[in-house]
């Protein structure tokens, strides 16, 4: 049945001139069928370089929105419309507008893990890989940083000269790692390097050997001479790490580090998306233009 589903997906993909993008946290079988696997911004940018009519984005809602922002002439499909992001959802747009009034001297730097509406209110966007670099490059001494308080704390450590006004959001999956989990994992695997995501709690980051985004973790594991790694991010990334580094061993800090929203998408929902042209993700043009400017400014600031 799985093989038949895969065959149907591949046939429809060819027929519709579509590409399938899968985030690093997706199910193994979804990663296997994807044309590209990566983090949200990498994937959206990849889509701009590929000659296609349809983008099937296997991820969560804000990621498909980002793809639509960067690819206005392409049809962007999100196979599971209920695949949301609790962290992105912490930002209430009306409350954010009140923050803009309260702190008129502080532009917004928004993590790409935000809605199109939030990006449209932002001076610049950032990723977990370039957040310190972006905040440092923004020509203002005070910054409103949304939505992740843990990433904001990580940025503060790298850019102490900036006043960072942080939104009180966090990723529930990364936030579940505690200091004790690191200590326990190190005790179980004393020869392994601990690599964690900057969305983790500050006390977890303090105990890590290396801090990186998912794409950064992939590069770090590939380049390191070390053979064992304890990975502090959603367990979906371990599939890619093991696949690309068969001679190395990867341990999850916690096997329960599963983002339920990232696991909703299945081969069946991808097939339905291509068959039924669902669910089309569109961003109103006035919002898209402003959000696009924030994403482009990020790229300009680090070029």
UniProtKB/Swiss-Prot annotation:
GO terms for cellular component: cytosol. [4Fe-4S] cluster binds at residues 85, 171, 259. It is found in: Cytoplasm. One of its GO terms (molecular function) is 4 iron, 4 sulfur cluster binding. Its EC number is 2.5.1.72. HAMAP family: NadA_type2. Its main location: cytoplasm. It catalyses: iminosuccinate + dihydroxyacetone phosphate = quinolinate + phosphate + 2 H2O + H(+). Keywords: 4Fe-4S, Cytoplasm, Iron, Iron-sulfur, Metal-binding, Pyridine nucleotide biosynthesis, Transferase. Pathway: Cofactor biosynthesis; NAD(+) biosynthesis; quinolinate from iminoaspartate: step 1/1. Pfam families: NadA. Catalyzes the condensation of iminoaspartate with dihydroxyacetone phosphate to form quinolinate. It is an enzyme of class 2 (transferase). This is Quinolinate synthase. Iminosuccinate binds at residues 23, 40, 111-113, 128, 197-199, 214. Its cofactor is [4Fe-4S] cluster. Binds 1 [4Fe-4S] cluster per subunit. InterPro entries: NadA, NadA_sf, Quinolinate_synth_type2. GO terms for biological process: 'de novo' NAD biosynthetic process from L-aspartate. The gene is nadA. Belongs to the quinolinate synthase family. Type 2 subfamily.
């Amino acid at each position: 049945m799985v093989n038949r589903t895969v065959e149907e997906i591949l046939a429809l993909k060819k027929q519709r001139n579509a590409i399938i993008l899968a985030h690093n946290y997706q199910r193994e079988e979804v990663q296997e069928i994807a044309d590209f696997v990566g983090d949200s911004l990498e994937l959206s940018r990849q889509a701009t370089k590929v000659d296609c009519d349809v983008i099937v984005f296997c991820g969560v809602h804000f990621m498909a929105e980002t793809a639509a922002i960067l690819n206005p002439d392409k049809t962007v499909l999100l196979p599971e419309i209920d695949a949301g992001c609790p962290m992105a959802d912490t930002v209430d747009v009306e409350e954010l507008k009140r923050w803009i009034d309260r702190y008129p001297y502080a532009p917004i730097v928004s993590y790409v893990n935000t809605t199109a509406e939030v990006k449209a209110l932002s001076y610049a966007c950032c990723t977990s890989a370039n957040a310190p670099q972006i905040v440092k490059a923004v020509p203002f001494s005070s910054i409103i940083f949304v939505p992740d308080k843990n990433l904001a704390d990580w940025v503060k450590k790298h850019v102490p000269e900036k006043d960072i006004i942080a939104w009180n959001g966090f990723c529930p999956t990364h936030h579940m790692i505690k200091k004790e989990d690191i200590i326990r994992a190190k005790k179980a695997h004393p020869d392994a390097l601990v690599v964690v995501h900057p969305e983790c709690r500050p006390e977890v980051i303090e105990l890590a050997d290396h801090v990186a985004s998912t794409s950064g973790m992939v590069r770090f594991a590939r380049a390191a001479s070390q053979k064992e790694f304890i990975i502090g991010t959603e367990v979906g990334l371990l599939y890619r790490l093991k696949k690309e580094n068969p001679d190395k061993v990867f341990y999850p800090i916690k096997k329960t580090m599963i983002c339920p929203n990232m696991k909703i998408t299945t081969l069946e929902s991808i097939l339905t998306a291509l068959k039924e042209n669902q669910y089309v993700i569109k961003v109103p043009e006035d919002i898209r233009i402003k959000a696009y400017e924030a994403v482009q400014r990020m790229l300009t600031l680090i070029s």
